[in-house]
Amino acid sequence: MRDKLKSFFTEHWKYMAVSTACKLNIFDHLKEAKTAKHLADELSLNEDKLLLLLNALSNAEILDKTSNYFKRNSLSELLTENNPESLKYACLNWNDEHLTAWQNLDYSITTGKSSFEDIYGQPFFDFLNDNPEKLQAYHKAMYQYAKDDYKTLPDLIDFSKHKSVMDIGGGYGAVLENIKAKYPSIDCILFDLPKVIEKVTIPSIKKLGGSFFEKIPNQSEAIVLSRVLHDWNDEKASLILKNSFEALPQNGTLYVIENCSDK
């Protein structure tokens, strides 16, 4: 029991090792086996410290090690930039500001206020909108998560009864991409902020820019809200729902997809 408890104390070490390797593009450069010296020279890193990191990743079975050579395996292959199934940005998403906010959790529990806002002086999504690189990285992460998490959604919901489906706050379009793959005849419409929409490169879906706190265009007989409402307080979540209902035709359908707790 004590050992199980003690293991909790250092769980973040593994994540920090993996996310640091992602941040430094280490996995991208280990398609072929290399020594720590070779990789350090290639990426302008400190050889001694890099060797410690590579050994840690090998012990965690994230890298394969043969003699003094390290090479990525099937796990770390998923943390490379150009892999179609990549989780690199999903991994990086929980670093930096997220970690800092978690370290301030006691403030939130004590005051009932946002630990993120206490540190950064603004709500999380305002912070993203003021930092374009962070915004792009965030939506890349959400896209990578959604490609996995919503892979079976078109099997669970019969979208064939709709001529059109609009994803509200759909980021880079992963949900619609999954729907379109199974129901190619459906008109798929992505609605998100203009600065998000301009980065979307899926040719098979229509893209509309705007805010779900304002008017949502009446262009679809079905609307999907996937993991949107939990990001907002009750007042703003109610406004999103109100605007979504107003955007639907009389017999339209609203699909709300959320992770639900017991209460």
Give the location of each predicted region:
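Alpha-helical subdomain
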Residues: 1-59, 64-65, 75, 159, ...
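Conserved Class I S-adenosyl-L-methionine-dependent methyltransferase catalytic core
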Residues: 2-29, 41-42, 48-163
